[in-house]
């Protein structure tokens, strides 16, 4: 195995500031596992990092946290994971292990948490390091491409299973037909909920895909009256739950009066600004439970991998482009054009 590798690194804060650099291949010591990366999905957070939209980012750092690969080396304190195992990994690289959240394995809430691809070098490289506790073995029939979607799917499982307990009887709105919205849709249909998927005119191709993936109703909110659609479907009561994957304040405020009294609003997408103006009148008067859903934790991953392995998620429809690691910039540009669903980077295309 070579002692050096290539990686896509955010070198400094600000717009772009990206470079394709040489790095030393990390060593798997203690409880760490070294993974030869097969695929990495480009996440919306990677694009925000590229654009310099996060304050005080850790730099330099190799990006990438949605990945799959094969174990090539294990540390001395790794009893279960073996060289040759096909794996994916949670994004948690370090937690304090002492706070109340860590004691409940709610690692996404640990105030000292460090994540792969954000504070610790990530998977947009030939190799990535992970801790054994974060590793999940892949079923034999689950492809590396599909497994690289485990992380964003786990985030959606967290929102639907843990934070809001979506049920068969529920009628819901999912706002934003990007990758996260489409993952939420497919989970909801697996559960059996009635789904109204919303977007705007430029999302036409994504709304069409949403219909193909099982959305009961699709609504272009620039052309159709969402309130009228919801009131007709729910006899005026409103939907049971709204999941926002858009991070668009106008969309959020348009949906709040359409939630059934004592219903739920689940914020999955991130807003561009820390402070936003919300329709608090609807939240109060309708007794809406407004819920934040942050990332994922260990409890979400087995469900996500099971959904992928059983075919509940349409892997082929979700992955619309693949690029070798050397063409990472073209891959980022393609994502930023806004016409793709999920773009994958192949770190070792000659081997997987």
UniProtKB/Swiss-Prot annotation:
Its cofactor is Mn(2+). It holds the Pfam family ADH_zinc_N. It catalyses: D-arabinitol 1-phosphate + NAD(+) = D-xylulose 5-phosphate + NADH + H(+). Binds 2 manganese ions per subunit. Its EC number is 1.1.1.301. Keywords: Manganese, Metal-binding, NAD, NADP, Oxidoreductase, Zinc. SUPFAM superfamilies: GroES-like (SSF50129), NAD(P)-binding Rossmann-fold domains (SSF51735). Optimum pH is 6.8-7.3 in the reductive reaction and pH 8.3-8.6 in the oxidative reaction. Mn(2+) 2 binds at residues 96, 99, 102, 110. The keyword NADP applies. Inhibited by EDTA, 4-hydroxymercuribenzoic acid (PHMB), mercury and zinc ions at a concentration of 2 mM. GO terms for molecular function: metal ion binding; NADH dehydrogenase activity; NADPH dehydrogenase activity; zinc ion binding. One of its GO terms (biological process) is arabitol catabolic process. Mn(2+) 1 binds at residues 43, 65, 151. Homotetramer. Involved in the arabitol catabolism via the arabitol phosphate route. Catalyzes only the transformation of D-arabitol 1-phosphate (Arb1P) and D-arabitol 5-phosphate (Arb5P) into D-xylulose 5-phosphate (Xlu5P) and ribulose 5-phosphate, respectively. It can use both NAD and NADP. Belongs to the zinc-containing alcohol dehydrogenase family. This is D-arabitol-phosphate dehydrogenase. It comes from Enterococcus avium.
């Amino acid at each position: 195995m070579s002692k050096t590798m290539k990686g896509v690194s955010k070198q400094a804060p600000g717009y772009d500031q990206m470079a394709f650099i040489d790095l030393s291949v990390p060593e798997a010591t203690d409880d760490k596992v070294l993974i030869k990366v097969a695929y990495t999905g480009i996440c919306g957070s990677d694009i925000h990092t590229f654009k310099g939209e996060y304050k005080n980012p850790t730099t330099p750092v190799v990006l990438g946290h949605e990945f799959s690969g094969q174990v090539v080396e294990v540390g001395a304190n790794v009893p279960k994971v073996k060289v040759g195992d096909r794996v994916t990994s949670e994004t948690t690289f370090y937690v304090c292990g002492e706070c109340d959240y860590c004691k409940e394995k709610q690692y996404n809430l640990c105030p000292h948490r460090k994540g792969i691809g954000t504070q610790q070098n990530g998977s947009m490289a030939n190799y990535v390091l992970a801790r054994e506790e974060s590793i999940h073995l892949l079923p034999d029939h689950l492809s590396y491409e599909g497994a690289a979607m485990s992380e964003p799917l786990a985030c959606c499982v967290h929102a639907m299973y843990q934070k809001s307990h979506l049920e068969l009887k529920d009628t819901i709105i999912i706002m934003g037909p990007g990758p996260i919205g489409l993952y939420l849709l497919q989970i909801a249909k697996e559960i059996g909920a009635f789904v109204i998927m919303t977007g705007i005119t430029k999302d036409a191709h994504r709304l069409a895909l949403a219909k193909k993936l099982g959305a009961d109703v699709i609504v272009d909110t620039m052309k159709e009256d969402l309130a009228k659609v919801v009131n007709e479907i729910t006899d005026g009561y409103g939907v049971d739950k709204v999941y926002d994957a858009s991070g668009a304040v106008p969309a959020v405020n348009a949906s709040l009066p359409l939630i059934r009294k004592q219903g739920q609003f689940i914020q999955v997408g991130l807003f561009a600004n820390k402070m936003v103006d919300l329709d608090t009148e609807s939240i109060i008067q309708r007794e809406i439970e407004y819920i934040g859903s942050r990332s994922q934790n260990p409890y979400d991953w087995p469900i996500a991998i099971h959904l992928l392995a059983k075919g509940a998620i349409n892997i082929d429809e979700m992955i619309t482009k693949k690029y070798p690691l050397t063409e990472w910039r073209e891959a980022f540009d393609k994502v930023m054009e806004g016409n793709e669903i999920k773009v994958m980077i192949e770190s070792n295309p000659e081997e997987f």
